[in-house]
């Protein structure tokens, strides 16, 4: 049986109605501001080792592509502010590192030859840890259907006269 004193999520209140006119808890709203894309060369530097250099080049490209894919969407749906830059940057790094681990698993396999025989490829553990962190970022940023239901989109500053439904 459901606890009658438990708060309902704001979206559920909207869907089911609010007959008791209980206040709907809203979070702190920051004014939206443009996010500046980080210099991915700082995170994935050019190194002397050719294999690592290629890996870092690919990670830079993956992170850059993910940033450019999600920031415009998040700006509209979640109203990102400058304080959110680090969270989005970490999200993009997770995506790039998961790609790096998956490529390693595809080329070297799940089990590799070690000093003492066959052992699990370390990329399997690392990929799992990054996936757990990525799931947290997806929830924080509202990048999944269930997480989007918990977000309130930023209000547009439109005049009431400009309403297309009038």
What are the language-model segments listed below?
Residues 2-18, 91-101, 105-156:
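Amphipathic alpha-helical protein-protein interaction segments
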Residues 40-111, 166:
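An amphipathic, hydrophobic-aromatic interaction surface with interspersed Lys/Arg
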């Amino acid at each position: 049986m459901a606890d009658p004193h438990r708060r309902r999520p704001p979206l559920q209140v909207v869907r089911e109605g609010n007959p008791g006119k209980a206040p709907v808890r809203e979070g702190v709203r920051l004014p939206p501001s443009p996010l500046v894309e980080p210099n991915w060369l700082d995170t994935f530097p050019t190194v002397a080792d050719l294999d690592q250099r290629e890996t870092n080049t690919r990670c830079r490209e993956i992170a850059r592509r993910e940033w450019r894919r999600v920031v415009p969407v998040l700006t509209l749906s979640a109203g990102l502010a400058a304080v959110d830059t680090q969270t989005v940057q970490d999200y993009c790094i997770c995506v790039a590192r998961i790609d790096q681990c998956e490529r390693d698993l595809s080329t070297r396999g799940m089990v590799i030859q070690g000093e003492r025989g066959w052992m699990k490829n370390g990329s399997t553990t690392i990929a799992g840890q990054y996936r757990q962190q990525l799931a947290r970022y997806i929830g924080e940023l509202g990048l999944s259907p269930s997480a989007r239901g918990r977000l309130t989109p930023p209000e547009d500053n439109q005049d009431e006269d400009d309403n297309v439904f009038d």
